[in-house]
Amino acid sequence: MTSPAQRHMMRVSAAITAQREAAPLRHATVYEQMLVKLAADQRTLKAIYSKELKAAKKRELLPFWLPWVNGVLEQGKGAQDDILMTVMLWRLDTGDIAGALEIARYALKYGLTMPGKHRRTPPYMFTEEVALAAMRTHAAGESVDTRLLTETLELTATADMPDEVRAKLHKITGLFLRDGGDAAGALAHLQRATQLDCQAGVKKEIERLERELKPKPEPQPKAATRATRKTRSVTPAKRGRPKKKAS
């Protein structure tokens, strides 16, 4: 655990180094020290096979990096920062979509790139990982603020990425909106998902929502009841033989 003084120093150091707009941070002493710590954390994670245990370990490690992240986001001017981008990915792996989005706004604004051997561009990576994090949350029966998902779609709307990736995010957004009772919003996202990927697996759900949203026929007024026929009263026949007519 770091002390309050250490966290403050870390935050200030991050802010100072992040203000070097065009200069690479690799020549900053404090940044290099933080990269050494990050590499040690990554080695710890690499030794863990279970994805669930690995996510739990990342959740344990993340608080250490919070002062650095805050310093960059508050005063940074767009210098490439591998620490920041790694923390963004770790936050997604632990289901912290809101925290990752906080970094993504900054990263996409300044065009930061993914560190190391990551082949996906930041918008591509972020969209896909947000979708996967939301899918894991949905599978666990938990909820996600759909505003985070729609903001991600808006933030990466003009970025190039496989259509199937964007379709994943539209699909899970639609499913959460459906669960929240927004049938019209859900239908729009699911329709967009199937436009982007015909194998998105949402056709039956689209049909169900379309039936739900289809206007119900207005109830017809009841037909007027027919007037009951008056039945002629029949005079009961007199008993006995009828009288003979006079001849």
For each feature predicted by the language model, list its residue ranges.
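Residue at a conserved register position within TPR or TPR-like alpha-solenoid repeats
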Residues: 72, 90-91, 134, 170, ...
